[in-house]
A protein has these predicted regions:
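N-terminal alpha-helical interaction blocks
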Residues: 1-94
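Short N-terminal secondary-structure initiator segments
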Residues: 18-39, 99-119, 182
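Residues in well-ordered beta-strands of folded domains
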Residues: 27, 59-60, 68-70, 124, ...
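Short N-terminal helix-initiation segments at or just after the protein's N-terminus
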Residues: 93-99, 169-171
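Acidic, metal-coordinating catalytic segment for phosphate/diphosphate chemistry
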Residues: 100-101, 105-149
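N-terminal strand-loop-strand
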Residues: 132-174
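The catalytic Nudix box helix
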Residues: 173-184
Length: 184
């Protein structure tokens, strides 16, 4: 699965460290990621490969940091182009694939928090934690946590699998679901 990156370690604590030349850049545009694929594996651009306008620390895998590059239009060069994130699961699992999936979640969250849901004023990134803060009314918004369950239903050597009809990749999957509002 995407998160199975052992022996590597994912660190999602917020940090304000400066990007280094060999750190990785996660640049999303809609439902695409600026990257390239080599031998079925995802390759992410490095800080030294792009002209970043504003990098936002996302997380680290081991000692390697990943940064979000928002509102940028990177040119397709050196094999890098915008790849449909719905097809990421077709690639070989590894730290770059985990970074792409986790980064997309943060990208979508930051993109959806541009304006305060309480007063409508523009939000700002917190300077003390991973949060968006409204300077007008003080409303603070944190990334959503969506509890989920994935189960294997089996009878001896038989296994119940599902297949999602409207997904770009038509793979079989275990039965899965999310906790909705009001459920426990």
């Amino acid at each position: 699965m995407l998160q199975d990156i052992a022996p590597h370690i994912y660190h999602n604590q917020m940090s304000w460290k400066e990007p280094e030349a060999d750190d990785f850049v996660l640049c999303y545009r809609g439902r695409t990621l600026y990257c390239k694929v080599e031998d079925g594996s995802l390759v992410l651009p490095r800080v030294k490969d792009v002209e970043p306008s504003a990098l936002q620390y996302a997380f680290s895998i081991d000692e390697r940091a990943d940064y979000l590059l928002s509102d940028a239009e990177l040119k397709e060069a050196n094999g890098f182009s915008y790849f449909d994130t719905g097809k990421l699961r077709t690639l070989v699992p590894g730290p770059a694939l985990m970074a792409a999936a986790a980064g997309e979640s943060l990208y979508r969250w930051y993109s959806g928090q541009r304006f305060c849901g309480r007063c409508g004023k523009p939000m700002e990134k917190s300077r003390i934690e991973r949060a968006m803060v409204c300077p007008a009314c003080g409303n603070t918004v944190y990334p959503k946590i969506c509890p989920a369950v994935i189960v294997a239903i089996h009878d001896g050597d038989r296994l119940v699998l599902t297949k999602y009809k409207d997904r770009p990749v038509k793979h079989y999957a275990l039965v899965a679901g999310f906790n909705e509002i009001g459920e426990s």
